[in-house]
Design a protein with these regions (language model features):
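Non-heme Fe(II)/2-oxoglutarate
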Residues: 401-495
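Catalytic core of non-heme Fe(II) oxygenases with the double-stranded beta-helix
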Residues: 461-475, 479-577, 582-612
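Short coil turns that delineate tetratricopeptide repeat
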Residues: 37, 71, 75, 108-109, ...
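Start-of-helix register in tetratricopeptide repeats
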Residues: 7, 41, 75-79, 112, ...
Length: 612
């Protein structure tokens, strides 16, 4: 064969890319495309090379073009689509990745496309659909990836023992894979088998997945509320893997919660100084500083990031919202234009574009962006939350159908569980148990709490009889709330009505008088959200300004004319249920009293018996 033979040139370029010689691969495929510019294998390989070079936009364009060109066998077309799906998922485009993985499976039954689709669905908090996708795999074709994903999907739907059983039935060949042991450690921890979980994870510390093992061991210690040992694992992690973004972020977050409000982000700053090109570390720093209330420092970090990466959509979009919130409309518009030019198909960018438009009073643009978001992700809570704001700002009464608290929210005063004389007596005992868990000094850097503490509760592994009684107590009111939903396939809350539900998250929040509050927020990964009041200070019971009450409808952005639409007065034993896309907040309240609550998110289950 001549060296000008396209097949030989393609093989040479493939070989160079596999060997990590991206420069040679790029030059080879460029010569090949001069000879055959519309040959699908060459176009697709050029996309893979562009991905290796870090040019994700060009990589996507080339991969999509290779799918559009004629003459590709169905099995090869499936592989091309699978590669594009992996690119989109890794770049943060889950909705687009889902569509492309499904395109791959329409072309041919490709196990890696099926596992890629399942992983994407799990990341979008759609475990029931992920289970359906995984169960369609022919036995033995998915390998350890399918086994681990199936276990994770079962765990997310509340089938904890079934998730464990999947792993115990794994083949002998799977036992040599670290992904198996990481999954096993997580499943054992969720079942409360902490000693066995640690035994599964510790051997991984000497292998190539030591960073993942340290994160898993940290999660295990946090599950046990052993904060100091969790801190030890994270500090060891950043010592060995200083450029690992998740380890650095987790360490900063835990140090903040343990009371280090001054130096918690120093580790990230040091790594950015050493490696200015680390975009992910810069983004993590911006997020941490913003959630710590250090807005000016966060803005400075974002501007430095944009200077390092001119035109970067993420830094630009964040800065656009920051400028909009601080009455700098011209800068906000310039930043969001940059972000939209770079990533018009990214949900995060469209969300910030909607916010900037709302603050600026550009209501038609806000309606356009929010329509795009809800069309793209019909179950996306952020899109619907912003949509309701846009409709309200436009004076469109359709917002009431979606988010009027009188239609979609409910509060109920619960009866005590069996064995308790009154709801007050039950909550006094429950409050004592919860207080014992609130041993941190500050709020997490990823939630809405400010000047308070928030501690996770894990229904699946919870052994405290009072908390088990709480979960039993809320089962009926949740079921009644779901049963009361009318059939409406177009409604973001009602369309997901199912005969069963699962608790997808649960936590307790402690606020003290003076400064403790919740900033207005939604729950992006929920369906039904909640607040249950365990202890309520006298100062807020009849407060004239409703300080300390749960408010609905007021956004966290300065949008003209949009104030709270309703309030729930806290009372011991009262449960509030509402859509996860409903904006809600708690203002600070006077005095020194304690406001202690439990909150949870519920997600629908397509089939099964449901419950916590």
């Amino acid at each position: 064969m001549s060296q000008a033979d396209p097949g030989v040139m393609l093989a040479d370029a493939h070989r160079a890319l596999t060997a990590g010689d991206v420069t040679t691969a790029s030059a080879s495929v460029a010569r090949l495309l001069q000879l055959r510019p519309d040959w699908p294998p060459a176009v697709h390989l050029a996309g893979l090379i562009a991905r290796a070079e870090g040019d994700l936009s060009r990589a996507e364009d080339l991969m999509r073009r290779s799918l559009d060109l004629p003459g590709t066998a169905r099995a090869v077309r499936a592989e091309y689509a699978n590669n594009l799906g992996n690119l989109l998922r890794g770049a943060g485009y889950p909705a687009q990745a889902e569509a492309v993985f499904r395109l791959a499976l329409d072309a041919a039954e490709l196990p890696q496309a099926r596992t890629g689709l399942a992983r994407t669905l799990l990341e979008m908090d759609r475990p029931d659909e992920a289970l359906t996708v995984l169960r369609a795999l022919r036995r033995g074709t998915g390998g350890i990836n399918a086994t681990v994903l199936l276990s994770e999907a079962l765990a997310q739907t509340g089938e904890r023992q079934a998730a464990m059983d999947v792993l115990t039935e794994a083949g002998e060949q799977d036992l040599s894979r670290s992904s198996f042991w990481l999954a096993l450690g997580a499943r054992l921890g969720s079942l409360g088998r902490h000693v066995e979980a640690e035994a599964a994870l510790r051997p991984l510390l000497s292998g190539k997945d030591a960073a993942s093992a340290l994160i898993a061991l940290t999660d295990l210690r946090i599950l046990m509320r052993d904060w100091q040992e969790a801190l030890t694992f994270l500090r060891e992690g950043v010592r060995v893997f200083p450029d690992h973004v998740e380890l650095q972020t987790r360490l900063a977050g835990l140090e903040w919660m343990l009371g280090d409000g001054e130096h918690f982000a120093d580790g990230l700053r040091r790594r950015i100084a050493a490696r200015p090109q680390d975009r992910a570390m810069r983004l993590a720093l911006v997020s941490l500083l913003a959630n710590a209330g250090q807005s000016d420092a966060a803005e400075m970090a974002a501007r430095e990031g944009l200077a390092q990466f001119p035109g970067d959509y993420h830094f630009a979009a964040w800065l656009a919202t920051r400028c909009a919130e601080t009455e700098r409309p011209e800068e906000a518009q310039a930043f969001i234009a940059t972000a939209l030019a770079g990533a018009p198909e990214l949900d995060f960018v469209r969300e910030q574009a909607a916010i900037v438009s709302l603050v600026a009073g550009r209501i038609e643009a806000a309606l356009e962006h929010t329509q795009w978001l809800t069309d793209r992700q019909p179950a996306g809570q952020t899109g619907w939350a912003l949509r309701t704001l846009a409709l309200r700002a436009a004076g469109d009464e359709q917002w009431r159908v979606l988010a009027d608290p009188s239609r979609v929210c409910r509060s109920t005063d619960l009866e005590p569980p069996p064995g308790h004389a009154s709801i007050a007596e039950f909550n006094r005992a429950l409050a004592a148990r919860l207080r014992a868990r609130h041993t941190l000094a500050a709020h997490p850097l990823v939630n809405s709490v400010r000047n308070g503490t928030q501690i996770e509760i894990h229904p699946g592994s919870e052994t405290d009889p009072l908390l088990r009684a709480f979960f039993d107590m809320i089962r009926e009111p949740i079921s009644r709330f779901i049963a009361s939903m009318p059939p409406d396939p177009q409604h973001p809350l009602f369309r997901r009505k199912a005969g069963a539900y699962r608790l997808s998250g649960c936590w307790t929040v402690r606020l003290e008088g003076g400064a403790g509050h919740h900033v207005s927020h939604i729950h992006p990964r929920g369906w039904i959200s909640s607040a249950y009041y365990v202890s309520v200070p006298e100062e807020i019971t009849h407060h004239p300004r409703r300080a300390g009450w749960l408010s609905f409808g007021k956004p966290p952005y300065p949008i003209r004319g949009l104030e709270a639409t309703a309030w729930v007065q806290p009372a011991v034993g009262r449960l509030a249920l509402f859509p996860s896309y409903q904006w809600h907040a708690v203002e600070s309240f006077p005095g020194q009293g304690e406001r202690l609550s439990i909150a949870f998110d519920a997600a629908p289950i397509a089939s099964g018996t449901g419950g916590s």
